[in-house]
């Protein structure tokens, strides 16, 4: 039996993976869900928990939960991005010389160890789904990954008993997933990857199956996580103005608030309004008060405007680096879960024309699907990358 190679999109907020079976991408699943939160809970005793189980721990034990480890993977302690991440991290992030460690209880964990817990969980789930031992993988990385990221993700994979056969830029993997390689066209492409923690723009020249990056630019602190943070701040601000209560002071309640904002954001991607409720969210005069609101999409979009402005700045900069105007771009592919936010799609369509902009129906899985397609080059009989057929809607 041929050894299975899996393709992994190790994301800031979520991780997903899959492999090729025939010409079909089969996805790794955790209780039928192919999108696995990149969240790790480190208990006082026992094994770590990864994914949705860890997410549920955020509300009760935020100081033992690590989110968005990708943001500091491979970075040195003096980096300004690290300082900003540490200020909002549940688990305490400290510097030891030029190294970073999470202090959780009486133990210390390097970011690579936390990342390895996620990769190890992916490997275990893949072995359960596909059978046999899995030890090899293709891993994607941000087009704007910091210098130390490559070595750090390789070390994390080794801890998780995985050998990385190929590191591929996320925009290239995304381009494969949306089928841009299915034509022999020669054209200029723009791939916009709006994920949970980063926004990357890549200008690419396509000649059939050959994709040549011309320019790449990104914002490492702009993603769905940041939209969630702004959402939570907006709700907390409204509460403070009306009742004088400071929701930031209760770490557990604010963690719950942020979680509920994330869930509401997802609903607003397909609806113009959504209910927002949170029981005993804050206290006034010693008495608990709940939040019961209807959130209109335009209301939160106005509060997200500075973030969208930053995204457009990234697009303008990558066009400048490539020496292109919007009219020079033949196709724009939107990938990453945050690209499903309607206002972002509207802004990009206004800039390039709606007919040239495509949004992957599996935007949150596009990069992992592309990575899975690339495993075709590493099987027992290497072959060309096929056009994507996905099992997103298939039963587990």
Predicted regions and their residues:
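Oxyanion-binding/catalytic loops of NTP- or PPi-dependent enzymes
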Residues: 1-87, 92-94, 108, 117, ...
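Generic recognition of long tandem-repeat/solenoid scaffolds
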Residues: 50, 100-104
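Negatively charged
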Residues: 121
């Amino acid at each position: 039996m041929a050894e299975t190679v899996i393709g992994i999109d190790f994301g800031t907020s979520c991780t997903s993976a899959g492999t090729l079976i025939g010409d079909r991408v089969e996805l790794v699943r955790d209780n039928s869900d192919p999108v696995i939160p990149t969240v790790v809970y480190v208990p006082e005793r026992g094994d770590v928990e990864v994914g949705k189980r860890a997410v549920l721990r955020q509300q009760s034990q935020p100081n033992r939960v690590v989110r968005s480890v990708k943001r500091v993977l491979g970075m040195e302690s003096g980096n300004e991005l690290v300082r900003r991440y540490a200020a909002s991290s549940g688990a305490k992030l400290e510097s030891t010389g030029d190294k970073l460690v999470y202090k959780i209880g009486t133990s210390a964990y390097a970011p690579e160890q936390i990342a390895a817990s996620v990769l190890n969980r992916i490997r275990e789930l893949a072995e359960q789904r596909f059978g046999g031992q899995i030890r090899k993988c293709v891993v994607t990385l941000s087009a704007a990954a910091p210098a130390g990221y490559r070595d750090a993700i390789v070390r994390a994979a080794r801890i998780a008993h995985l050998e990385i056969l190929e590191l591929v830029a996320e925009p290239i993997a995304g381009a494969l997933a949306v089928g841009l390689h299915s034509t022999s066209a020669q054209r200029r492409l723009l791939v916009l990857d709006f994920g949970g923690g980063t926004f990357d723009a890549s200008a690419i020249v396509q000649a059939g199956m050959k994709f040549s990056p011309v320019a790449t630019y990104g914002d490492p602190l702009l993603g769905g996580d940041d939209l969630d943070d702004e959402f939570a701040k907006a709700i907390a601000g409204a509460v403070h103005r009306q009742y004088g209560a400071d929701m930031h002071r209760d770490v557990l309640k604010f963690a719950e608030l942020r979680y509920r904002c994330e869930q509401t954001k997802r609903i607003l991607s397909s609806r113009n309004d959504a209910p927002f409720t949170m029981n005993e969210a804050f206290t006034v005069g010693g008495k608990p008060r709940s939040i019961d609101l209807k959130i209109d999409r335009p209301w939160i979009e106005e509060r997200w405007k500075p973030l969208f402005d930053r995204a457009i700045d990234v697009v303008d900069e990558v066009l400048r680096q490539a020496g292109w105007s919007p009219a020079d771009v033949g196709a724009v592919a939107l990938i990453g879960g945050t690209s499903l936010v309607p206002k972002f799609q509207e802004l990009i369509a206004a800039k390039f024309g709606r007919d040239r902009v495509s949004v992957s129906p599996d935007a949150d899985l596009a990069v992992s699907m592309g990575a899975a397609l690339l495993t075709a080059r590493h099987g027992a009989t290497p072959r060309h990358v096929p056009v994507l057929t996905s099992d997103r809607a298939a039963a587990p």
